[in-house]
Amino acid sequence: MKRICSVYKSPRKSEMYLYVDKREALSRVPEALLVPFGAPQHVFDLLLTPERQLAREDVAKVLENIEKQGFHLQMPPGEEEYIEHLPEELLRMNDPL
């Protein structure tokens, strides 16, 4: 299954993205989701195929969600994931001497 998708970012929550079918745009996204998400800001369009790799999402799940519900919501990574990627010297800044 191939699908041209539009990706929107949330102005309220860093690293929160909404994937939708480009032809349908935001028409199938519930208002109850758009209120906390904020006014979606278009980032880019891309062709999704089962072979394509996404950085933080399973492309099969994204395609399935768009097919079934009209959108896929990518949540920001958890705080633990941010901490794992910090340089060691930053992690030690608050350590007692």
UniProtKB/Swiss-Prot annotation:
Q: Where is the YcgL domain?
A: 3-87
Please name the InterPro entries in this protein's record. Answer: YcgL-like_sf, YcgL_dom
Q: What is this protein called?
A: YcgL domain-containing protein PA1295
Q: Can you name the source organism?
A: Pseudomonas aeruginosa (strain ATCC 15692 / DSM 22644 / CIP 104116 / JCM 14847 / LMG 12228 / 1C / PRS 101 / PAO1)
